[in-house]
Amino acid sequence: MIMNQKPFNEKSSLVGAFGHMVIKQNGKLCGCGRRGCIEAYASGNAIDKILKKTNKKNISTKNMLINYKDTKWSKKIISEATTFIAEGIVNVNTLTGIRNFIIGGSIGLSHNFFREIIKNTKKITKQNILIIKAGLKNDSEVFGCLAKSNDE
């Protein structure tokens, strides 16, 4: 998260971590140990688990987003995952007034997934929120970590 043109980060590893915002009370267990985090519903790993439970064991999230993007079951999975992300975006906007959001990661940068995030955000709020793709693609987190380490 960027606030006042600087990476927002405290010593706690989860401060500023959008994916670890609880979006569903007593929800699915997340890798961080909490329940109901966005990441437990909308990450590549979370979608892989959904695919395995729906007898799509041989299909990865990336494969689904490329080769099965127009199937009914794929659209449902994408819609549900992106709704959780959209809720998180609207919550951050409501709490902080932040209106610009950058989406990264291999899943978030997928055209259909990204488009659904925007669509679902517009369904939830009338606020003028700008959502764009990370310019550094999958390397944005690496460069962010490097920038942060140079500050310390």
Model-found features: residue ranges?
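Short beta-strand scaffold segments in enzyme catalytic cores
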Residues: 1-2, 21
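Catalytic-core segment of enzymes that process non-peptidic bonds
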Residues: 2-9
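ATP-binding/phosphotransfer module of carbohydrate and carboxylate kinases, centering on a glycine-rich
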Residues: 7, 25-29, 34-152
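A short, polar/charged loop-to-alpha-helix boundary motif
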Residues: 14-26
